[in-house]
């Protein structure tokens, strides 16, 4: 990076990775057997000052794949009725084709070379997303196959709490527990939390890093 304006570009902030915030609601914990029922995807943008913010969110209710397991306890927890026609559910393939299209467009606009999933307890969401992509036999996924940014871990470090609701409140982000466990609501709160942590780190002087030459110059100053 040649100057601060370069450091304030999204393509330089995460080594060319474009962060995509995702939340899923499912019919259980097993990504191989349990249905993916809902997914929301929040795309981010960076302003001229290098501050990260929400761009837009996509949301889909998903039809359970053929033969999917539906755990009653999971459905009771998230309140989803997979048989309700008012859900307007689409197939996994239809949803992910739209997601791929939007993510790749935003990734290209930011001059990034790949996207990386951001999620709260990211291994869970990444597992369900990866398995759905595999089931649909979709090629050229924009997402890194294993790397993620986990906001539970980041919040534990930066804020001192790993629970999404608690971390948001401690960060000054309103959180309504009555709206929680909706993929749309949780994704946008997760996105706000991720942006807060990234921006706070910048405001505290953690980014951009000083180049080696700049560091030596600073050490020599009285």
Curated annotation (Swiss-Prot):
Tell me which SMART domains the record gives: EXOIII
Residue ranges occupied by any Exonuclease domain in the UniProt entry? 20-194
For this protein, the record's InterPro entries field holds: Exonuclease_RNaseT/DNA_pol3, RNase_T, RNaseH-like_sf, RNaseH_sf
First-tier enzyme category under EC: hydrolase
Q: Single GO molecular-function term?
A: nucleic acid binding
Q: Where is the signal peptide?
A: none
Residues the record marks as active site: 181 (proton donor/acceptor)
Q: Where does Mg(2+) 1 bind?
A: 23
Record bears the keyword Oxidoreductase: no
Tell me the keywords, alphabetical order: Exonuclease, Hydrolase, Magnesium, Metal-binding, Nuclease, tRNA processing
UniProt keyword Metal-binding, yes or no: yes
Paste the cofactor note.
Answer: Binds two Mg(2+) per subunit. The active form of the enzyme binds two Mg(2+) ions in its active site. The first Mg(2+) forms only one salt bridge with the protein.
Residues annotated as site: Important for substrate binding and specificity: 29, 77, 124, 146
Which cofactors, if any, are listed as required? Answer: Mg(2+)
Say what the protein does.
Trims short 3' overhangs of a variety of RNA species, leaving a one or two nucleotide 3' overhang. Responsible for the end-turnover of tRNA: specifically removes the terminal AMP residue from uncharged tRNA (tRNA-C-C-A). Also appears to be involved in tRNA biosynthesis.
Family, according to the entry, reads as follows: Belongs to the RNase T family.
What is annotated about its quaternary structure and interactions? Homodimer.
In terms of NCBIfam families, this protein maps to: RNaseT
| Protein name, per record | Ribonuclease T
Source species = Shewanella sp. (strain ANA-3)
Its taxonomic placement starts with: Bacteria, Pseudomonadati, Pseudomonadota, Gammaproteobacteria, Alteromonadales
């Amino acid at each position: 990076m040649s100057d601060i304006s370069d450091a304030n570009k999204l393509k330089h902030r995460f080594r060319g990775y474009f962060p995509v915030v995702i939340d899923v609601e499912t019919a259980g914990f097993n990504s191989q057997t349990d249905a993916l029922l809902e997914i929301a995807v929040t795309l981010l943008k960076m302003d001229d000052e290098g501050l990260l913010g929400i761009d837009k969110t996509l949301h889909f209710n998903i039809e359970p794949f053929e033969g999917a397991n539906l755990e009653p306890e999971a459905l009771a927890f998230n309140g989803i009725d997979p048989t309700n026609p008012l859900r307007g559910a689409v197939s996994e393939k239809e949803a992910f084709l739209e997601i791929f299209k939007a993510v790749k467009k935003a990734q290209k606009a930011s001059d990034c070379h790949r996207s990386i999933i951001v999620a709260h307890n990211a291994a869970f969401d990444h597992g369900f997303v990866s398995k759905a992509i595999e089931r649909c036999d979709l090629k050229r996924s924009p997402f890194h196959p294993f790397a993620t940014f986990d906001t539970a871990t980041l919040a534990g470090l930066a804020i001192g709490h790993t629970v999404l609701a608690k971390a948001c409140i401690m960060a000054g982000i309103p959180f309504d527990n009555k709206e929680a466990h909706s993929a749309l609501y949780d994704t946008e709160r997760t996105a706000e939390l991720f942006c807060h942590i990234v921006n706070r780190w910048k405001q505290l002087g953690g980014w951009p890093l000083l180049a080696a030459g700049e560091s030596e110059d600073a050490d020599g100053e009285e």
